């Protein structure tokens, strides 16, 4: 049986901290230069709520809905500390992804350090504790949590989970109230970071059993854990959070368990999107075999708890950590590699603990096998980290592991579209639609491609198809509104934008576009109100100030127009239309040199800005100057 050890800091702690920090930096060095990918784009890059603490506070007041478009369960999550960590990084680093990645690496390193300290406290030898933590830090399956900025919620929750366990161990030794307070705070913080924090209480019970604690202290800690869990669930309910809807896939839970174990041991192919791995069509024989295997593992834990305590503790940790993610609790994505982050620590402890008890030649053989496995894992991790540096490579490699993922096909389409390869983008959008005919995002994006190519009939048909599938999708209405506006069907555009806003009242893009439609219809008062409303919804939206300035200029209110255009540039110094409209303003007020300067700035930012080019050429022809320097 494991026993708590008196808390004394030693040189080994400092040396491990230094060595493990260097190890994590070496393993993940290639990810530092990676850009925002996958959910990072929406959750960080385009998330105005991270710009201030006041706006970020909304995540403490309300849960965030989510759904995975393929085999998802829907639901919502309540993770305010995760969002606050992103807001802090946004304030420190702006939109420099390197800073966000540095935070992720620091969290992973701290978790390895805390795991080392916890094992030492439980009288696991320094060598074994260091080996377990170093190996755990280098597992390739953790690349999703560490390299993906949005995967931080789990590593942040685990930081507090391990802190809670260290506080619990301290309380078992000392009975100090401050230790109990630290335990409660860490438990709550873990839950507010990610739902994986719910594991803190069962892990505490495992610690109490392993430490053979005094009954009274056992009751105090477990009771406090229950109170914290209840408080979190109540707060989550008040914020509108709820578990994913759907039927738990308990029948396939055994198969899911062994899939997770396989990913941890031999992640030959890895994927950022594992929703299609949820076992739904296994044969009865395979399902029964998986359950029998889990049952045999539980029996082995009971048999080994006295002879091989580290092995038994590691396997028990593994089972507890995986249980919620094996279909027992409905999860929006079903399965994911990041859900192994906690469980893998138990698996490594069991492997290293077993090796330490082997004798003679079997120990040497086991050691060689362990070295080979760890070395292969480091090589595999390096290859996977390189995938994270390139968005297309990340999705393509993930698709090899999960070829039936319509989400990955869609993301590949987006990546190729952003890279300017419209033909490949169309192919992947169509493949996503073929797999999931109700995938409205892919249908809309394919419509966008056809619209950009001038194929308006196909584009309109796709937008209408998306609306027919989901009339409550505001994006579909916005996109068909944009098409109508491009075709000068201004009344139809107005109706489409109004439908979008009715579904999503804070859709700034739809509100601004409604203003443009109203302006074309001659309703200048309505257009001005729309632009003002957009500014009220998002005061940082440069395009709203710019469009309002252009409208005021059209009305002859030059002073007010200039103020709005200057505000647009204050919010986005690289917004070319604001310079263009300032050029038009200066041209209108008889300041040709200033007009030329503004048109040139617009072209410096956007060389293919044809309206700016034609205005510049006209002004320079009038003043006798040359446009040579402005040609792309």
Q: Language model features by range: what are they?
A:
Residues 588, 593-632:
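Terminal, low-structured helical/coil segments at or just beyond the last alpha-helical repeat
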Residues 409-416, 428, 442-456, 462, ...:
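TPR/Sel1-like alpha-solenoid repeat signature
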